[in-house]
Design a protein with these regions (language model features):
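Helix-hairpin-helix/helix-loop-helix acidic hairpins
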Residues: 85-139
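Phosphate-backbone recognition surface of nucleic-acid-processing proteins
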Residues: 146-220
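Basic (Lys/Arg-enriched) interaction patch that binds polyanionic ligands
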Residues: 122, 126, 130-162
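Generic structural signal for well-ordered, non-transmembrane alpha-helical segments
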Residues: 33, 37-40, 44, 71-74, ...
C-alpha cells in the first residue's frame, strides 16, 4: 500500500511539473543553449572547411546562407559559382566532397531545429510572461525567469538583483578580489544597453531593471498585460538618458 501511494504521489508530481510553465521554459531554454553551442561549432567547422578549398570567400558576419548553399551544391564547382569565386587548382575527392556536403546539410538542419525550438520558447514566454516579453522580448524574458528559478521568484527579486541576473561569476569575483561589481547581467543582451555608449550603460541598466521588475510582478500576479505604448514610453525615457 505504501509503495502504491508513493507511486501515485510521484505520478501526480510529474503531472504537476509537466503543467508548470516555469519548468517547461527551463527545459526549452537549456535545450536551446545546448543546441546553439553545437550549431555554432558545426557552422565554424563548415566555414573553415569551405575556406580551405575556396580561400577567396569572405563570409564576414553573415554566414547564415552557407550551410544551405553547401548542402544543395552537387560539386565544389557549383558552390564556387554560387559564391562568385574561382575554382582552386586542388579540390576535394568525390568522397570528401560528399562528406563536406553532408556536413552542410546537417548544419542547415540543425539551424532549422534551433529556430523551431526558439519559436517554442517565444510562444510559451509570451503566454507566461506577457508584460516582460513585450518589454524585453520573449527570449530574454524567458532567460530572466529561468535564471530566477520561476516567475514568482523573479517578481519578488529587488530591481538591483534583476539587473545583475546572469552575472553571478563576476559578482563573486567582485566579493573575492575587490574587482569592480558587474553593472548588468543578461539584460545586457537587449539593444537598449548593448547599443548604448559605454558610459551610460549602468544607468540604463538600472532603469530597465526597475521596469522589468514591475513587469515581472504584473505577470506573476496576472495583472493587465503591458501594451506596446507602455514600452514606447520606456524607450523614450532611455533615449533621453543617452
Amino acid at each position: 500500500a505504501a509503495d502504491k501511494a508513493a507511486t501515485e504521489m510521484a505520478r501526480q508530481g510529474v503531472a504537476l511539473a509537466a503543467g508548470d510553465p516555469d519548468k517547461r521554459l527551463e527545459h526549452l531554454l537549456r535545450a536551446s543553449d545546448e543546441m546553439r553551442a553545437t550549431f555554432l561549432t558545426m557552422e565554424a567547422r563548415l566555414v573553415e572547411w569551405v575556406g580551405l578549398f575556396l580561400p577567396e570567400v569572405r563570409f564576414g558576419k553573415d554566414r547564415s546562407s552557407l550551410p544551405k548553399l553547401v548542402g544543395e551544391a552537387d560539386s565544389l564547382a557549383t558552390l564556387a559559382d554560387k559564391l562568385s569565386v574561382s575554382m582552386p587548382d586542388n579540390g576535394p575527392s568525390k568522397s570528401e566532397w560528399k562528406t563536406l556536403r553532408e556536413w552542410g546539410e546537417s548544419t542547415a538542419t540543425f539551424r532549422g531545429k534551433l529556430d523551431r525550438l526558439e519559436n517554442a520558447i517565444r510562444e510559451l514566454s509570451e503566454s507566461h510572461l506577457p508584460s516582460l516579453s513585450i518589454m524585453l522580448g520573449p527570449l530574454l524574458a524567458a532567460r530572466l525567469c529561468v535564471e530566477a528559478h520561476g516567475r514568482m521568484r523573479l517578481a519578488r527579486l529587488p530591481a538591483g538583483t534583476v539587473q545583475v541576473l546572469g552575472a553571478e561569476k563576476a559578482f563573486f569575483n567582485h566579493l573575492k578580489t575587490g574587482a569592480a561589481p558587474p553593472k548588468h547581467g543578461h539584460i545586457f543582451m537587449h539593444p537598449w544597453i548593448s547599443r548604448s555608449p559605454r558610459w551610460v550603460r549602468g544607468k540604463i541598466a538600472r532603469t530597465i531593471a526597475a521596469k522589468a521588475s514591475i513587469a515581472a510582478k504584473v505577470d506573476a500576479f496576472e495583472g493587465e498585460p503591458w501594451s506596446q505604448s507602455m514600452v514606447d514610453e520606456i524607450d523614450q525615457k532611455i533615449e533621453s538618458i543617452k
